[in-house]
Swiss-Prot record:
UniProt-recorded name of the protein: tRNA uridine(34) hydroxylase
NCBIfam families, alphabetized: PRK00142.1-4 (NF001136)
Organism: Rhizobium leguminosarum bv. trifolii (strain WSM2304)
Catalytic-site annotation from UniProt: C184 (cysteine persulfide intermediate)
EC assignment: 1.14.-.-
The organism's taxonomic lineage, starting at the top: Bacteria, Pseudomonadati, Pseudomonadota, Alphaproteobacteria, Hyphomicrobiales
Record field: catalytic activity: uridine(34) in tRNA + AH2 + O2 = 5-hydroxyuridine(34) in tRNA + A + H2O
Length: 309
């Protein structure tokens, strides 16, 4: 663990996923919800027949209790997780949801529990993506890739992961090189993507073990081939090398990450608009967003946290 993951930040953040057959996954929902609430843990966990996925945050002891409970279940005994720290609680509430898929691709008969690509450790990733026989693909969405990516990676510019299969099928040039290397934030999307690629006839398919988060934690910045910041799905918005909290903020109108420079734009109004969404929203939209911001401000004055903040 890097020096940045010290106890100077009070909240421990655990990102986790595990593809495994869970026949009675519904039985875990209430147990997990209660345990997390009792342990001061917030975030989101998704349960499905194909496994578990989510990110949670809380005091160290609370996170340890939840992880211990999960690993005590036979299906999740091999569960791995990635840790980082946050200066404030990055989630508003705890949600344990039942889903058809723990990461939604929308393609039938794709099962990472049966067929998947080859894991590549962070320390070996640079050599793979620097190989001229390798095509590198970022499996994340456009608002994520906009703030950071690996050098030389293809960006499908998808809005959702559901669009990824169509992008692959429409790009015959992906067959021009023998190796495909894919990555995502924590590893889950690229793992499912490798199962899809294998089903599409690609032979040498690789994915970054632990995702970008593990790479940023373990690979020194001076050796890194990562440029920019990594978008995360909590109130930190982004993290950088060493998993240090990034400087991006979130536009609460369009949910895009924005930089300090973009905040100075005349199109930016907190919670109402930014340069990414100003032209795609109506005045009626902005009026509604301003009313929401007003309610958020009132809640702050009362020492409360508005659900839309």
């Amino acid at each position: 663990m890097t020096d940045s993951l010290t106890h100077t930040s009070p909240f421990l953040v655990a990102a986790l996923y595990h593809f495994v057959s869970v026949p009675r996954f519904e039985n875990l929902q209430a147990l997990l919800q209660t345990l997390c609430e009792q342990s001061g843990v917030k975030g989101t966990l998704l349960l499905a027949h194909e496994g578990i996925n989510g990110t949670i945050a809380g005091p160290d002891a609370g996170i340890a209790a939840v992880l211990s409970f999960l690993r005590a279940q036979p299906e999740f005994s091999g569960l791995e997780h990635k840790e980082s720290r946050a200066s404030k609680m990055p989630f508003l509430r705890m949600k344990v949801k039942l889903k058809k898929e723990i990461v939604t691709m929308g393609v039938e008969d794709i099962d990472p529990n049966k067929v998947v690509g080859t894991y590549v450790a962070p320390q070996e990733w640079n050599a793979l993506i620097s190989d001229p026989d390798t095509i590198v693909i970022d499996t994340r969405n456009d608002y994520e890739t906009a703030i950071g990516t690996f050098r030389g990676a293809l960006d499908p510019k998808t809005k959702t992961f559901r669009e990824f299969p169509d992008w692959v099928r429409s790009n015959s040039g992906l067959h021009n090189k023998p190796k495909i290397a894919m990555y995502c934030t924590g590893g889950i999307r690229c793992e499912k993507a490798t199962a899809f690629m294998k089903a599409e006839g690609f032979d040498e398919v690789y994915h970054l073990k632990g995702g970008i988060l593990k790479y940023l934690e373990e690979v020194p910045q001076e050796e890194s081939l990562w440029d920019g910041a990594c978008f995360v799905f909590d109130e930190r918005v982004s993290v950088e090398h060493g998993l240090k909290e990034g400087e991006h903020r979130l536009c609460h109108a369009c949910r895009n990450p924005i930089t300090a420079e973009e905040i100075t734009s005349p199109l930016y109004e907190e919670g109402v608009s930014c340069s990414h969404c100003y032209d795609t929203r109506t005045e009626e939209d902005r009026l509604r967003y301003r009313q929401r911001q007003h309610q958020i401000a009132l809640a702050r004055k009362r020492g409360q946290r508005h659900i839309g903040s």
